[in-house]
Amino acid sequence: MDTVSRQLFEKAQAVIPGGVNSPVRACHNVDSQPLFIAEAHGCHLTDVDGRQYIDFVLSWGPMILGHDEPSVTRAVCDAAHRGTSYGAPCPDEVLLAEAVVAAMPSLEMVRMVNSGTEATMSALRLARAATRRDKVLKFVGCYHGHADPFLAAAGSGLATFSIPGTPGVPAAVVADTLLAPYNDLEAVKECFARHGESIAAIIVEPVAANMGLVLPKPGFLEGLRAICDQYESLLIFDEVITGFRAAFGGAQARFKVDPDLTTFGKIIGGGLPVGAFGGKRRYMELIAPRGGVYQAGTLSGNPLAMAAGLATLGILRKADYDGLENRTRAFAYSMRDIIAAKGVPLQMPTLASMFCPYFSEHEVTDFADAQKCDQKLFTSFYKQMRAQGIYLAPSGYETGMVSFAHTDEDFNRALDAARKVMF
C-alpha cells in the first residue's frame, strides 16, 4: 500500500544514505520500512499518514517523561528565544553539571559533549592518558557508539585481540581493543593475566541494553571493580542508556558499584543532542584547559540541550521510579504470559523502565545467547504489533522503554494487541 511514509522513504534514499540518518531506523531487521513521524505527545506518536502509535521506543531512551512534556518544552522555547548557540559558557551548563554530579555517586566533575559517541571516545582518551596505557577491554555485544576503537568484532577465544567490525576501521586502530563475553568474569581475569599491565580501562554497559536487555550477574560488576583496582586500570561505566533510567543515580547507584569514569547521553538532554562524561576529580582535571588531554566541541554545552536537560532532571528528582518500575514489570510479565499461552517460548527480562522480548526457551546472559533467539518470531511479532498501533524497537537487539507518560490504558491496549498476534 502506498503511503506518505513510503513516498518520503523513497525520496530520502536519493539524498540520504539508506534513507535514514541512523541504520536501525530503516527497519531492515524486521522486514519493514520506517515510519516518518509528524508529531509526538506523551507516549503517543502520529506518523505522516495520520496513524497513531503507542511508543515503547521513546527516541531510543531519552523521552522518559514522554514527548512534549510541558515544562521541558517551555524551557526549550524560552532558551531558544534567548539564542540557540553562543560558543561561550551559559548559566544552564553549570546548573546541569551540578545536577548530574549531585545525582551520580561516583562523579566529582563532568564535561558536556554532543553525543554518547563523543562521550565514550573522550572517556577512553582520558583513561589512556591517566594510566599511560593503550589497551581497552570491552564486551562482545556492548555498544559504545561508533568511534573506531569500539567498532571491533571478537576474534577466536574468550578474550583476544579484535579485528575490525566494519569497513573503514584500520586493523591497527582496534589492535588495542580486547574483547570478552559479557557476564564472564573468568574471561576478564584471563585477559588481565595476559595483558593487565597494558590495559588502561574496562568499558562496560552496566546493564547491557544494546543486545536486548541483559542484566549483570550477581558479582559481575563488583568483580570488574576489583580487577581494575588490582591492576590499577580504570573502570568506565557507559550509562548513556541507564543514566537516570536504571535509577535516578543510574546503574552505579542501583548496583552500588562506583566506576572511575562514566559516560552519559539521552535523558540528560531531554530529547536534544547531548552527551557527557565525568568521574573523579583527579582524572577530570587532566582535561584541557586545566590539563593536557584535549577535548573540544563547538556546540558542547549548547543552551537548548542544557535547558532541556535541566528541566528534565528537575522533574525526575522527585519522580516515582519505584512506581514506574512496578508498572513496567507488570506490563512486561503480562505480555510474556500472553505469548507463552500461545505456545511460543518468550523470555522477558526487565529492569527499571526497560524490558525486552526474547523469543527463546533459555535465559539470555550474553550476546551469544541473544544471537540464538528466534528473530523470525520477533519480526512477526513486531510487524503485527505495529499494524495494531504499538511501536516497538525494530530490532531484537534493542531494549523496550516505558515512560512516566504511559497509562494503564496504554498498557492494556498493547496487551490487547499482543493477544491478537498469530504465530
Swiss-Prot record:
* Primary site of residence: cytoplasm
Q: Which GO terms describe its biological process?
A: protoporphyrinogen IX biosynthetic process
Is-annotated flag, keyword Signal?
no
Give, as in the UniProt entry, the pathway in which the protein acts. Porphyrin-containing compound metabolism; protoporphyrin-IX biosynthesis; 5-aminolevulinate from L-glutamyl-tRNA(Glu): step 2/2
Cellular component per GO? cytoplasm
Assigned keywords, A-Z: Cytoplasm, Isomerase, Porphyrin biosynthesis, Pyridoxal phosphate
Q: Give one GO molecular function term.
A: pyridoxal phosphate binding
Is Isomerase included in the keywords of this UniProt record?
yes
Descriptive protein name: Glutamate-1-semialdehyde 2,1-aminomutase
Provenance organism: Desulfovibrio desulfuricans (strain ATCC 27774 / DSM 6949 / MB)
Q: What is the lineage of its organism?
A: Bacteria, Pseudomonadati, Thermodesulfobacteriota, Desulfovibrionia, Desulfovibrionales
In the UniProt record, the gene name given for this protein reads hemL
